[in-house]
Amino acid sequence: MGNMFVILAALLFTGTIGGLSGSIGMGLFDLMNGYASSVPKTVILKFGIGAIVGCVAARGKNKNAKSPIKWISIASGILILIGIVLFFTATSLGNEIVVSGIEKKLVINPVLYIFSLILGLGLALVCTFAKKLSIEIQYAVLGAVAGIAFNLVGEFLFGVFKLLLVGSGFLPAILSSAVSLPATLINGSFSIFVAVALYVPLSKSLSNKKVNL
């Protein structure tokens, strides 16, 4: 839920506002609930999500902005390709793959390819009906995807770094950090769809209020 509100705030207002609201609010939550060690990661990632979403979405408000459908199509293709590769890898080799020289097995959680395919197909639908969507909404979708992509990479890298600090080997750290990605991907997919769905009516409401003022 937290990422969804960060994205929504960044879309409705600015990336700075969205990033600050997310980093401060979720950072304080971690601090007050016994997760003090996670505060730096939370602050950096949530601000990054807001900043990236706001930066990308702001381009859609430019009168001369061109449709970003090419980039949405690329994102859709990448996600679908990842989902297909993971699916066939899991079905042919199994969900648990033994990597030579590493004790821990590489686990391909079905959630990874299922939600990768769902998100990819969702973006494909956006591309299909792009002509019915304004340039602003198209950039909002692209911004939300970019923000969640940043969060996925950030969560993974922070996880690897944290494990390396406590003495883990490099490859085991990578595998262990990858285990948390399914939950992050589910949260991210939910955040993108809900934030954009709420943004459409709320942005119109805010625009009408500005006109009335």
Regions found by a protein language model. Give the residues of each.
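Loop-helix junctions at membrane interfaces
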Residues: M1-L213
